[in-house]
Structures are given as C-alpha cells and as structure tokens.
Amino acid sequence: MSTMKIIFAERLTYLMKIENLSQSELARRIGISQSAVCYWLYGKKEPSIDSLWKLADYFDVTTDYLIGREKD
C-alpha cells in the first residue's frame, strides 16, 4: 500500500472517530457509496478528487491534510 493511501486511511479513520461516524453514515452525508469508504479505509482504492473535496468540506480540513501533504 502506498504511503498516501496509508496516511489517508489513518486520517479518515481519525476524523470519523472524532465525529462518531460509521462508514455508512459518512457515505450518506457526503453522497457516496459505503463501499467506497470501505475501500479507502482498507487502502484498496484512492478517492477521486471530487470525493476528496467533499471530505475536506465535510470535516473542515484541507485536501492536503487528508493526503498527508501537511501535518495538521
């Protein structure tokens, strides 16, 4: 698994935990499939740019944070 996928999965897991969100609830709130969230968390697929934007907007973080280009 690439470093970006690992960092993304770790950060998404962290953000979901803070918000107490399940995979299905996050998927519903940002308009994607639950299977997409599952694939991201297990490093099977990378999110699209559109999905990254949705996640960044939802969690109020930058896309750079999500993919590990900035620390905080």
Residue spans for each PLM region:
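Short, charged recognition helix plus adjacent turn
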Residues: 1-6, 39, 67-72
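A short, Lys/Arg-rich alpha-helix, primarily the initiator
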Residues: 1-21
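Short, Lys/Arg-enriched C-terminal cap helix and immediately downstream tail that follows
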Residues: 15, 49-50
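Residue-level detection of the helix-turn-helix DNA-binding "recognition helix"
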Residues: 17, 31, 42-44, 71
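Residue at a beta-strand N-cap/secondary-structure junction
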Residues: 20, 46-49
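Short alpha-helical DNA-recognition segment
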Residues: 20-39
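DNA major-groove recognition helix of helix-turn-helix/homeodomain DNA-binding modules
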Residues: 50-65
